[in-house]
Amino acid sequence: MNAVLSLARPEILTIKPYSHAAWLPSLTRLHANEAPWRPTGDATEAGLNRYPEPQPAGLVQRLAELYGVSAETLLVTHGSDEAIDLLSRIYLRAGLDAIMQCTPTFGMYQVAARIQGAEVMEIPLDRSRGWSVDVDRLLAAWHPRVKLVYLCSPNNPTANSLGIAALEAICQALDGKAIVVIDEAYIEWSNSASLTPWLARFPTLAFLRTLSKAHALAGARIGALLGHPDMIQLAKRVIPPYSLTT
């Protein structure tokens, strides 16, 4: 069993996911218990009376092309907040596991962890050195109960990138030991290129991406979790069946 699976909660490995109604336009969808008529004013192509496709194939493929990854390594989520929640539910056991984050940073990492009953370990960024991450301090503080390590780069709210050398050192040291999550919500506004090609190097690495910022689609709530195909399959066991809207 690879580390992506062995780090997960045992229950997730055996849970039977919700079986959503088959999504084929050619079907007469009596099995989905949907209203057969459209509501007044509905001008959508798919029809608001119908459940949406859980993972729209066209959207998955377009996002995979945009981020330079294969479709099997991408899950479309209801904003990147949902991806954070999914990772917490997959990997964190209440009262046993922990996350690590570099503060100050985006608040949802710790919110999702605390909802799951996990400990939150904080490694302060070094303000005197441009809010850089202290790699040695982070690695010294890590212990096997830390299942998720969040690295927001560019960081919210300090706006700085954490540095390729620092991120690479953390990924190398924790490969196979923890899920390292690099949040690239603001990467389009950075001088640094996305590090998503590292997925081929580090199986326990994951990325968060979103269309909310540079693409000005915050109201559409379209995010993505990028990771090893086994991680994406675990997430598909946990994600609500119709979290994306038509």
Where are these regions (language model features)?
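Phosphate-binding glycine-rich loop
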Residues: 56-98, 116
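Active-site pre-lysine segment of PLP-dependent enzymes
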Residues: 114, 121, 132-145, 157-180, ...
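PLP-dependent aminotransferase class I/II
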Residues: 204-246
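Short glycine-rich anion-binding loops that position phosphate/pyrophosphate groups of nucleotides
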Residues: 33-36, 80, 106, 153-157, ...
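PLP-dependent aminotransferase-like
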Residues: 93-151
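Short active-site oxyanion
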Residues: 47-50, 72-73, 97-99, 221-222
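N-terminal "arm"/small-domain region of PLP-dependent enzymes with the aminotransferase-like
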Residues: 1-66, 145
